[in-house]
Amino acid sequence: VENLNSYEYTLIEIWEADVSGREDSVWKKIEAIGGEQGWYYGTILWKTRGAVDKLLGGIGYRKGRPFRELRNGDQVDFWRVVGVDKSRKYLKLQAEMKLPGKVWITYEIKANRFFQKIEFIPKGAFGRVYWYLVKPLHYFIFTQMFRAIVK
């Protein structure tokens, strides 16, 4: 288990939308994310990021996921399921790619609200610089993914 005390703070971005009457259809999209389905937007960009990761000695873009309901510990491309609860419509994935920090993406439906949350804990100055350099691209990609899931 890695000691997260060596990391400084958490940077968070949250998207939120009203999905009244569509909670189940939105959850079905969340449950199916990754693998053959892709990421609803920018899958080629995710594959490119995976190629860069492989060059840096990481795992690369491991396309795939189980063909059943997700469980804790399952692989979803280069993410790992670290929290899933179908009854709460909750899914949390942790990135396994090479990064100057730790990153998670959480999808959750509470009542009639759908949330997509990105959490990044940078490691050192390079982690903070990395976050701010990629933030515009990540913001665009994650916004488009969010819109596609809500649609």
Functional labels for PLM-detected ranges:
Residues 1-60:
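Hydrophobic ligand-binding cavity/cleft-lining segments
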Residues 10-18, 90, 104, 113-115:
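Intrinsic-disorder/low-complexity, polar/charged segments enriched in Ser/Thr/Lys/Arg/Asp/Glu/Gln
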Residues 26-30, 81, 116, 149:
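Hydrophobic pocket/interface hotspot
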Residues 58-76:
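Secreted/surface-exposed cysteine- and glycine-rich disulfide frameworks
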Residues 75-77, 89, 101-105:
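Short beta-strand or tight-loop elements
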Residues 83-85, 111:
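A residue-level detector for short acidic-glycine micro-motifs
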Residues 85-93:
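Short, hydrophobic/aromatic-rich segments at coil-to-beta transitions
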Residues 94-139:
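Beta-strand/loop substructures that line and gate deep hydrophobic ligand-binding cavities in soluble
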